[in-house]
């Protein structure tokens, strides 16, 4: 039996479509015949339904996955305040422990063929003490998919984020252009520039260019993603 596959989804910023792309990937993996699960290890911003605290991003991941994970595995740390996680955690007296997340990820991988782990905010978001989400990605040891919100300033944001990922010794399995600004001028030129620079500097291929969608459709977006190429990259780096 082959080892389960997993990847870490990060982005150039918050609100650039990490959850949207993660759910699109889940649809693509399911269409490829894989048992696909998702984790949102740290979620900040919760609402209550039927006496249970929930998170909108986690709900979307659950809806797209074809393997359901217990909430304690899918989201070990659910914070009520919609704020930076270290701020929300401090206000709630919660210690954001990376080892707890690593253990939850191990259990998730026992239940699925592929596990999508969605980060929180950008690549470097403080968690506790001197540790941040980059440390979480390193502890998980997963290849990274970078989501680039295609809007003004995205070239610098993407290149800086890619450099930060590489500086931590992590492989960039690829990147996704998510066109969040329908009115952006020269969007194609920005994507072409990033395609050349990220391939040349980090060997990171463009896995998909997702058009602006209103309303967004993860299932439709999944058809813009080269899931087979991503799976090939994940299999190359998976433990033997």
From Swiss-Prot:
Catalyzes a mechanistically unusual reaction, the ATP-dependent insertion of CO2 between the N7 and N8 nitrogen atoms of 7,8-diaminopelargonic acid (DAPA, also called 7,8-diammoniononanoate) to form a ureido ring. Its cofactor is Mg(2+). The active site is at 40. One of its GO terms (cellular component) is cytosol. Mg(2+) binds at residues 19, 57, 118. It catalyses: (7R,8S)-7,8-diammoniononanoate + CO2 + ATP = (4R,5S)-dethiobiotin + ADP + phosphate + 3 H(+). The gene is bioD. Gene3D superfamilies: P-loop containing nucleotide triphosphate hydrolases (3.40.50.300). Its main location: cytoplasm. Its EC number is 6.3.3.3. The lineage of its organism: Bacteria, Pseudomonadati, Pseudomonadota, Betaproteobacteria, Burkholderiales. This is ATP-dependent dethiobiotin synthetase BioD. It comes from Burkholderia thailandensis (strain ATCC 700388 / DSM 13276 / CCUG 48851 / CIP 106301 / E264). One of its GO terms (molecular function) is magnesium ion binding. Homodimer. Pathway: Cofactor biosynthesis; biotin biosynthesis; biotin from 7,8-diaminononanoate: step 1/2. Belongs to the dethiobiotin synthetase family. One of its GO terms (biological process) is biotin biosynthetic process. The keyword Signal does not apply. It is found in: Cytoplasm. The keyword ATP-binding applies. ATP binds at residues 15-20, 57, 118-121, 178-179. InterPro entries: DTB_synth_BioD (IPR004472), P-loop_NTPase (IPR027417). Keywords: ATP-binding, Biotin biosynthesis, Cytoplasm, Ligase, Magnesium, Metal-binding, Nucleotide-binding.
């Amino acid at each position: 039996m082959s080892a389960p596959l997993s990847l870490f989804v990060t982005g150039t910023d918050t609100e650039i479509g990490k959850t949207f792309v993660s759910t699109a990937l889940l649809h693509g993996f399911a269409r490829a015949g894989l048992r696909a699960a998702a984790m949102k290890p740290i979620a900040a911003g919760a609402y209550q339904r039927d006496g249970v605290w929930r998170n909108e991003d986690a709900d979307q991941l659950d809806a797209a996955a074809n393997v359901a994970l217990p909430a304690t595995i899918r989201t070990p740390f659910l914070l009520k305040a919609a704020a930076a996680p270290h701020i929300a955690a401090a206000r709630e007296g919660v210690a954001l422990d990376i080892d707890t997340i690593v253990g939850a990820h191990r259990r998730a991988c026992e239940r699925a063929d592929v596990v999508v782990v969605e980060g929180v905010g950008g690549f470097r978001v403080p968690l506790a003490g001197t540790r941040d989400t980059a440390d979480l990605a390193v502890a998980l040891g997963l290849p990274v998919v970078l989501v680039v919100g295609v809007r003004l300033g995205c070239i610098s944001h993407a290149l800086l984020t890619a450099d930060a990922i590489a500086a931590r010794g992590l492989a960039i399995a690829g990147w996704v252009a998510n066109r969040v600004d329908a009115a952006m001028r020269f969007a194609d030129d920005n994507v072409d520039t990033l395609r050349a620079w990220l391939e040349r500097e980090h060997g990171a291929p463009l896995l998909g260019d997702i058009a602006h969608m209103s309303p967004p459709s993860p299932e439709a977006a999944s058809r813009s993603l080269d899931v087979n190429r991503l799976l090939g990259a994940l299999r190359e780096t998976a433990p033997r």
